[in-house]
């Protein structure tokens, strides 16, 4: 009792004559905070605990034990009992009998190892007995002698020892072979009080009496109706595992049976870790306690009998209380095996021992391999001799008697020095992860145990605590010096099983192995992988697609399938220092790619070819009818696209085009007779020049079939590849027309071969692409080409709903000075009528008139019909989708949203184009290097404006910047002239005219206005204008050469008499004096005389005198070169 009115746990347990663990368990049940035996609790809590413990005692003594959970009982085989005696009689008889024999018997005889246990004071043990359940079977006095050996001793088998078999030890003659049955618990208390020295517990010895073997054979015949007693554990919900083997049919006892102290809590002998079995004064009792177990020999087999353990009474309805035969280890219905001798494997009753050793795999039910004293890691060092391990298969071979499975002893038994390593604990087995609780009450007993137990070197004594794992899982992983070590359940806590260690160490090793790779090694490995990947794809691409944003040198190298160092070297030779992470603009990318022979296509242009809007809606499905196909003619410039269309239309459009090239999208409808029916085809003629990429993309976007025109004498060219990519992006079928087959050098097969490299394989070569050789000039195979086009379009299900409001795409748009904004529309669904309200992107309009390609006015236009519509409030953007709305209000709301978005996009583009570094600009201005060419661009159609702007972007801008202040389709107005005068810009007109007053204003303000019809000339003049802004270069121009033939000295200077061999020499010109191919002077010619007369120049074939103020070291044979510096127009650096 503390001064504060509290009481400690160990004081309460002492008053109640109970273990600390019992009191702690009771406190936990009552939710009273008590962590250890030294914890303090209040008097009120102590009273509650006392009441609970007293109630448990009374209930345990009066009621049968509760059924415990499966796989957690400690099962002990007992003799079938005829009539239950009283508890006091049974306990008194057993203990008295055990007390007498344990003090006299059992000298160790075989290398059976013993597991020592920790000591306990007699008083504590006595109190524990009271707390243990005591209903025991009734045993008559006549059967007491016979039952004792059967209940108490296990029949364990020891393997055969081939090297050094131990002879049987003669029994002690001073002891009678018979023993009267007494209460084992009382006997333990008496023994512990009388012994002055701890007894040594050797292996269980078989009794010599005949009755022992007979009773052992009969012991399994336990009636299911007769309950077997079992110790009531402190934790009733933690059943134990069976640890003892079943009895053998015959036991030949050569020694007197040693019952041992089988009280579950054990006495002080067990506490100190010293084996029991012989009194302190008896000779030989402690002579070889760890090397030789006691037992009886039968041949080379040692037969051991375990100590009895009382079992709880179990009901016979399928429980574990009374089962016989081959039971499944750890199963829910376990038979009662015989317990092992010694207190090391004590039950839960007083000590709280939660787990027991599990039987080996392959052993008979209930059989457990004996443990030799030499296997105790912390108490005994192993000896040097070794024997083979026990064969588990031998343990299964045993006779059966009366339905009870009995074990046959193995042939060999290992010596203590070479005990076989036990396998790792079986995961999932019952009891493999149960917690153990310590069997001591204070640190003094633990210290005494350590001092008394010799330890192996470098092996630590592990004390089992409350949170420790099961003994079976832990003892299997310990081995010292190549030998397996079996630890005492009371004293040692082994490490984790080997299997778990290995499995746990593997991930760690893998992690360490990964960490060993340094950054340089990882980079080297990545470089090797990339190099291998590049080597695998050495084939250079035919064309690369560059995104709208800039790409880095490394990305360009990957696209070109070359090393980045090659790109850097190419840029270095062009005066550009770059790294692998530096971004490149489009012009630089095109220049580098051109060196490697790969054309470049912008990704945004390819995206423009993709069909983004579905023209047919769900409401149109019921009203769909067949529509004419839209055919786009594509190909490289001058490959004959327009001539082919002229041959189809029987017209002469190409002759009327400026420069003989197409610069607009021409939309035509042609009626063709097919299968005695007139079929309509809509053709779109796209420009082939490289500047009109966007036009080609728009043409592909609305097409159903792409006709790829390739000249038979020229083959596949860059724009041909671009057209192929557009067609593939739009996912439309391709029909190849191999044109100009009538020209010399035409090779259609070579064209097919080149196209097959682009995965376009002709049908006659086993592919699926239609290729038709034609001649547009002579009209050869034109009908066959049209027929093939119709066949291809028939495969495509081309339908539209003409009974709805029109939807389509703006093919082209321009500003006409008489008609205003004009848009070429292709109706793709529905019917467009005059007077419809049309919204084309951010532009709103009302169709005032429609005309076809021949200028014929139309009232309506159905699906796949191209028309020119008038009535827009401004020029729409080519490529936008248009849609007809039922009223102007709904159309205006849609257009307003689009206009705001377009305005924001346009502003962002302008800001991006004008974004420049302030420091770079100021430096260029100071050096005079900043040159700008301001332009105002007016063209006939929107597509031409786009083409010109795209071409201007590709011009070099390192020294001269081109700024387009205004670009729009339409005629040149007076407003444009005023803007050009204010900004010093040049007005560029493309296929357009000047409005009234614009010419006069341009002359008044000295504004340069240029008008062009061919895009080639326009781009050439703009480049010349940019070069004109550059400072001219000074270059040397050689004018003559003279030879020194005489030297005249005049005062301090000297004059060279020369003969003009080439050209002429002028006074004050630059001269260079060479002597033996070395320049000795470079300067001005100051004096030139001929016959003492000063002259301006001397021509070839005459003699003259030459003097230089800064040079007088003339020698005969010198060569004088005369030259002058002239300015030369600079070229743009490309």
Curated annotation (Swiss-Prot):
<feature type="domain" description="tr-type G">
    <location>
        <begin position="626"/>
        <end position="798"/>
    </location>
</feature>
<dbReference type="GO" id="GO:0005525">
    <property type="term" value="F:GTP binding"/>
</dbReference>
<dbReference type="GO" id="GO:0003924">
    <property type="term" value="F:GTPase activity"/>
</dbReference>
<dbReference type="Pfam" id="PF11987">
    <property type="entry name" value="IF-2"/>
</dbReference>
<keyword id="KW-0648">Protein biosynthesis</keyword>
<comment type="similarity">
    <text>Belongs to the TRAFAC class translation factor GTPase superfamily. Classic translation factor GTPase family. IF-2 subfamily.</text>
</comment>
<feature type="region of interest" description="G3">
    <location>
        <begin position="685"/>
        <end position="688"/>
    </location>
</feature>
<feature type="compositionally biased region" description="Basic residues">
    <location>
        <begin position="511"/>
        <end position="524"/>
    </location>
</feature>
<feature type="region of interest" description="G2">
    <location>
        <begin position="660"/>
        <end position="664"/>
    </location>
</feature>
<feature type="compositionally biased region" description="Polar residues">
    <location>
        <begin position="83"/>
        <end position="105"/>
    </location>
</feature>
<feature type="compositionally biased region" description="Basic and acidic residues">
    <location>
        <begin position="438"/>
        <end position="450"/>
    </location>
</feature>
<feature type="compositionally biased region" description="Polar residues">
    <location>
        <begin position="56"/>
        <end position="65"/>
    </location>
</feature>
<feature type="region of interest" description="G4">
    <location>
        <begin position="739"/>
        <end position="742"/>
    </location>
</feature>
<feature type="region of interest" description="Disordered">
    <location>
        <begin position="491"/>
        <end position="524"/>
    </location>
</feature>
<keyword id="KW-0963">Cytoplasm</keyword>
<feature type="compositionally biased region" description="Polar residues">
    <location>
        <begin position="137"/>
        <end position="147"/>
    </location>
</feature>
<dbReference type="InterPro" id="IPR053905">
    <property type="entry name" value="EF-G-like_DII"/>
</dbReference>
<feature type="compositionally biased region" description="Basic residues">
    <location>
        <begin position="495"/>
        <end position="504"/>
    </location>
</feature>
<dbReference type="Pfam" id="PF04760">
    <property type="entry name" value="IF2_N"/>
</dbReference>
<feature type="compositionally biased region" description="Polar residues">
    <location>
        <begin position="251"/>
        <end position="264"/>
    </location>
</feature>
<dbReference type="InterPro" id="IPR009000">
    <property type="entry name" value="Transl_B-barrel_sf"/>
</dbReference>
<feature type="binding site">
    <location>
        <begin position="739"/>
        <end position="742"/>
    </location>
    <ligand>
        <name>GTP</name>
    </ligand>
</feature>
<dbReference type="Pfam" id="PF22042">
    <property type="entry name" value="EF-G_D2"/>
</dbReference>
<feature type="region of interest" description="G1">
    <location>
        <begin position="635"/>
        <end position="642"/>
    </location>
</feature>
<dbReference type="Pfam" id="PF00009">
    <property type="entry name" value="GTP_EFTU"/>
</dbReference>
<dbReference type="InterPro" id="IPR000178">
    <property type="entry name" value="TF_IF2_bacterial-like"/>
</dbReference>
<dbReference type="InterPro" id="IPR044145">
    <property type="entry name" value="IF2_II"/>
</dbReference>
<dbReference type="GO" id="GO:0003743">
    <property type="term" value="F:translation initiation factor activity"/>
</dbReference>
<keyword id="KW-0342">GTP-binding</keyword>
<feature type="compositionally biased region" description="Polar residues">
    <location>
        <begin position="208"/>
        <end position="234"/>
    </location>
</feature>
<dbReference type="InterPro" id="IPR015760">
    <property type="entry name" value="TIF_IF2"/>
</dbReference>
<protein>
    <recommendedName>
        <fullName>Translation initiation factor IF-2</fullName>
    </recommendedName>
</protein>
<feature type="binding site">
    <location>
        <begin position="685"/>
        <end position="689"/>
    </location>
    <ligand>
        <name>GTP</name>
    </ligand>
</feature>
<feature type="region of interest" description="Disordered">
    <location>
        <begin position="55"/>
        <end position="465"/>
    </location>
</feature>
<comment type="function">
    <text>One of the essential components for the initiation of protein synthesis. Protects formylmethionyl-tRNA from spontaneous hydrolysis and promotes its binding to the 30S ribosomal subunits. Also involved in the hydrolysis of GTP during the formation of the 70S ribosomal complex.</text>
</comment>
<dbReference type="InterPro" id="IPR036925">
    <property type="entry name" value="TIF_IF2_dom3_sf"/>
</dbReference>
<keyword id="KW-0547">Nucleotide-binding</keyword>
<dbReference type="InterPro" id="IPR027417">
    <property type="entry name" value="P-loop_NTPase"/>
</dbReference>
<dbReference type="InterPro" id="IPR005225">
    <property type="entry name" value="Small_GTP-bd"/>
</dbReference>
<keyword id="KW-0396">Initiation factor</keyword>
<feature type="binding site">
    <location>
        <begin position="635"/>
        <end position="642"/>
    </location>
    <ligand>
        <name>GTP</name>
    </ligand>
</feature>
<feature type="compositionally biased region" description="Basic and acidic residues">
    <location>
        <begin position="391"/>
        <end position="403"/>
    </location>
</feature>
